[in-house]
């Protein structure tokens, strides 16, 4: 049995922003400002990758290119993409500054990890500027990871394993099976699998579900169960070793990998 040494969390949809609503709203607002409508599902399908890359992927979608050409009589340029990103970034920075809340059980899980001497780290699709504000606001609410990594710290963003590898090196961890990646997207699971670590997917707060806590509560039981089953299947297909409803279920999974001596230390 191998003790878990580090748990690496995603941010939006995992630690903050139940339903990962803010990035979707920011992407839609950026394209709406340019007169282009984008469906929420199309935005969410690549959720978790670095945000410049996400803008570029959205700009390459055939329906976006057709709408852009119809409006502007030309294709989308690099300058257009930069303008879209700048709008997106400012919108999201404002949301992070004013709307950041923790998802349920974050602080309880943090207490568990610290009590068991397990490192806490994060990876993200946020830029450093976004991460700085998210970390500051989450810190005011009591969440304090030891190490936070963005794509700007490494050669390649998610789903590449570079950010996780960076964290393992920083903590002198050599066995990836002593590391757990927790996230709410397909990209999170792929990142974890590419790094060879254990992966845990979240359902209730996830981008895949895409609902606020209030809307989740109002969801009919039959619909809820069907959606949960679909998300579980999606996360498992992406490489999730475990799929849980929310973070309150994480300690029970981690306990399976702790030696009795450490469990009762």
UniProtKB/Swiss-Prot annotation:
Keywords: Hydrolase, Magnesium, Metal-binding, Schiff base. Mg(2+) binds at residues 10, 12, 184. Binds 1 Mg(2+) ion per subunit. One of its GO terms (molecular function) is magnesium ion binding. InterPro entries: HAD-like_hydrolase_sf, HAD-like_sf, HAD_sf, PGP-like_dom2, Phosphonoacetald_hydro. It comes from the Bacteria. It catalyses: phosphonoacetaldehyde + H2O = acetaldehyde + phosphate + H(+). It is an enzyme of class 3 (hydrolase). The active site is at 10 (nucleophile), 51 (schiff-base intermediate with substrate). Its EC number is 3.11.1.1. GO terms for biological process: DNA repair; organic phosphonate catabolic process. The keyword Plastid does not apply. The keyword S-adenosyl-L-methionine does not apply. One of its GO terms (cellular component) is cytosol. PANTHER family: PHOSPHOGLYCOLATE PHOSPHATASE, PHOSPHONOACETALDEHYDE HYDROLASE. Involved in phosphonate degradation. Belongs to the HAD-like hydrolase superfamily. PhnX family. Homodimer. This is Phosphonoacetaldehyde hydrolase. It comes from Latilactobacillus sakei subsp. sakei (strain 23K).
